[in-house]
Amino acid sequence: MQPGLIAGIGLTHLTVYDQRPAPDGLQCGCAHVHAVTDEAYFVLSGVGAIELHDLDRGFRSAPLGPGSFVQFSPGTLHRSVNKSGLTVLAIMGNAGLAERGDARIWFGPDVDADPERYRQLWRLPAEKGLEGALERRDRSVSAYMELLRLWEDDREAYRTELKRFVGVHARTMAPLRERFQEVVSLGPAKWLQSALSRIEGLPLSTASSDAVSFAPEGGEPKLGMCGLLRPMDLFAQI
C-alpha cells in the first residue's frame, strides 16, 4: 500500500482564525501564495469568504458556506475570511510541499527585500504560540490592505505589485527544486505508477492485506497561515 493519502494529496481540518480581528476588522488568516501546489477548500461548517488575486483576473472574493467548494492554482494569492465559525477541509496537491517552503506570506515589498525580517515574521508562531500567529497575521494584513487599495485606485500598479511578489516567491523557490521533486516522486508520482501497474495487471486481483488505513482524531492543532490546522498525517493499519 502506498504511504499517505490517495494520489499524494494532503487533507487538513482548518478553522480560520477568529480569536480577534485583524487590522482591517476581519477575522482572517494571512494572505499567501503557493509556488507549485494547487489547493482547494470544502466547507464543513460556518460561513466566510476566500479572497483571490491573480494576474489574469485580479481580485475577487468568493462566498463560503456549508458544502461549498473552491479550487485554485499555484500563483494565486489568497486569504481566508471567517464570518461565523468557518471550518473547512483544506485539500492540497503534493502533500508536504507547503511545509517545505512552497508557501510565501504577503508582508509587502519592504519585508520581501529583507530575507532575515521575513524569516523573523515567519517564525513568530513557533516562538510565541497563538499570539505569535496572530501577530504574524496582523503584520500580513497591514501590508495586504495596501494591495487592496491599489486594486481600487490603480489597477496597473496593483498588477505590477502582484507580479513582483509572485516573482520574488518563484525565485526564492528555485533552489528548492530537488527537494520538491523528491516529495512529488515519493507522493503523486508513486501513486500514478501504482495505478498504471494495477491497470496493466488486469484482470488479476489487486487486493492487498494492508489496504485499510485509519487516522484517529485528536492531537493539538498546529498554527498555520490561515488558522488552526489538524492535518491528517498519522495513519495506522486496521
PLM feature segments, named:
Residues 54-75:
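Short acidic-glycine-tyrosine-enriched beta hairpin
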Residues 13-35:
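Conserved short histidine dyad/triad with adjacent acidic residue
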Residues 85-152:
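Double-stranded beta-helix
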Residues 49, 68-79, 86:
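Histidine-centered metal-chelating micro-motifs
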Residues 179-238:
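C-terminal non-catalytic accessory extensions
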Residues 31-34, 38-43, 61-62, 70, ...:
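His/acidic/aromatic-lined binding-pocket segments of jelly-roll/cupin-type domains
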Residues 35-50, 54, 91-93:
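Short, conserved beta-strand element in jelly-roll/cupin
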Residues 124-205:
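An accessory alpha-helical subdomain
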